[in-house]
Amino acid sequence: METVKVTRKDLLLSPENKEIDSLDDVSALLSQRLSNVFEFSIASEEVQSDEVFEDTYPNDDQATFNLFSDVNTVVTKVTEPSIKNSRPLNYYILEDSPERQRQLQASVFTYDQLMKAKEEKWPACQKLHKVVSIKKEESKHRRRPSKKRRIRMKLLREKEEQLKRQAMAAKRNRFRKNVRKLPNKKKH
């Protein structure tokens, strides 16, 4: 392609930029310029505009444009059989059959049976050591002394132990002194 230098002066003075009075002239000029650039084929005016639209866009669901849908969304219409979520009537209402009546009769506990069971001894209930009695004094728990009090008590115990040790040491020393004062007995 050749590069052509175009100035503003050339554009303003060019014979193509005449004032166009009618719309037909404008559309003809526009179509001429577009056909030079894009190489469009001009459709004949004989075909009605409704017919052109119907030919290019048939009534298909696939051709519809969803404005707010995702680009990658694929819609598949899969119909699944509906599930019946209700229970059968025999779940709520029982039929009275002879077998069911026999089962009920076997599980019934009569008054006479209850009175007989009352007279029977229950060995597990006879053991007195299973009974727990709680006295009021036992329920009170001794509170733990505070930290300061525990430290004081520990110091007092240490002091008492030290005094005992000193007393024992003094007693031993007195005993040793007494032993030294005793006359020695000679063995013959």
Swiss-Prot record:
Taxonomic placement: Eukaryota, Fungi, Dikarya, Ascomycota, Taphrinomycotina
Record-listed Phosphoserine modification sites: S14
Protein's cellular compartments: Nucleus, Nucleolus
One Pfam family here: DUF2011
GO cellular component: nucleolus; nucleus
UniProt keyword terms in alphabetical order: Nucleus, Phosphoprotein
Biased composition (Basic residues): 171-188
Region described as Disordered: spans on this chain: 165-188
InterPro entries: DUF2011
Transmembrane segments: none
Official protein name in the record: Uncharacterized nucleolar protein C630.06c
